[in-house]
Amino acid sequence: MTSPSTIKQKFIAKGHQLGVVAVGFSDGQPNQGVDPSGLIEAGLLDQLRDDLEYDIRHDGQVHTYAEFVPEHDPNHRGMKKPRTVSAATQQLSRQVYEHAREGRLVLTLGGDHSIAIGTISGTAKAIRERLGREMAVIWVDAHADINRPEDSDSGNIHGMPLAFLTGLAKDDNEDMFGWLQPDNLISPRKLVYIGLRDVDRAEKRLLREHGIKAFSMHDIDKYGIGRVVEMALAHIGQDTPIHLSFDVDALDPQWAPSTGTPVRGGLTLREGDFIAESIHETGSLVAMDLVEVNPTLETLGASETIRAGCSLVRSALGDTLL
């Protein structure tokens, strides 16, 4: 029987209030069907409410942001659907900001990883206003997602969010991420990756040039997941709010096959849960994203992927083995 967490949360003003935003947005990449409905139908929100005793604040909708999609959205700087992704993430940023400003822990269920432009920008702004400090981002993913538009081979914006969020990519057009202001951004020094194993050449160069802390699967194989998480948290520092952005493709396809860009040689589900548990234990978590669950891909593995996603969220929000 699961019981609520006893870990004191340092940066959450409203105790067990959990702001939830469900986002069925797929336009940052080519595969439709990236949607959190399977997670919700599997009982994830009920588990968080009944077992972990969260006071859930959710509007009951899965937001697609279809009403914000422009009639014409030609490529810009190589980006595909830039106005669509910009409009959706700007709206999501406002939603996350409202929850975080009220002092709630925020959970966003995606959606492809382009939505992090919205979630992280909203959390960063709220934390600056409410606490007067910068937050850190722990990005758990097979991919670095820090391509600048001109460096991207695909043009898919789900491979670019961290370039915009760190200010390494900018655009002056309001309808193409020009709405991002300094208080929406994070410092590259406050970004840590875990689980990388498919990183583009230009991204490797950016990581080196800007001294961004990154732990690949090589590091996990060498040191073990426990030591890697220790080093990641030490880099961030003890008194720093944490936004955890978890792409389910960080897990090996054995555990999460129903995702758009699976890469073999990834985390086990237990390693993924350990990362989430360890971040919860710090008491510093202020927001979490779970993204790239797509039950329409590898349909035979859809239930396995959904179970894995639910486990990662529960672990980050205080579920324990004992």
UniProtKB/Swiss-Prot annotation:
Any one Pfam family match given in the protein's UniProt record, by short name: Arginase
Keyword presence, Disulfide bond: no
Assigned GO CC terms: cytosol; nucleus
Known EC number: 3.5.3.1
Top enzyme class: hydrolase
SS bond list: none
Residues binding substrate: H143, A144, D145, I146, N147, S154, G155, N156, D200, T261, E292
SUPFAM superfamilies: Arginase/deacetylase
Obligatory cofactor(s): Mn(2+)
Entry's Gene Ontology BP terms: arginine catabolic process to ornithine; urea cycle
Cell membrane found in the keyword field: no
Catalyses which reaction(s): L-arginine + H2O = urea + L-ornithine
Sequence positions that bind Mn(2+) 1: H113, D141, D145, D247
GO molecular function annotations of the record: arginase activity; manganese ion binding
Pathway(s) annotated for this protein in UniProt: Nitrogen metabolism; urea cycle; L-ornithine and urea from L-arginine: step 1/1
Keyword annotations of the record: Arginine metabolism, Hydrolase, Manganese, Metal-binding
Residues holding Mn(2+) 2: D141, H143, D247, D249
Free-text comment on the cofactor: Binds 2 manganese ions per subunit.
Matches recorded under NCBIfam families: rocF_arginase
PANTHER family in the record: ARGINASE
Family per similarity comment: Belongs to the arginase family.
Record's subunit section: Homotrimer.
The protein's name: Arginase
Gene: ARG
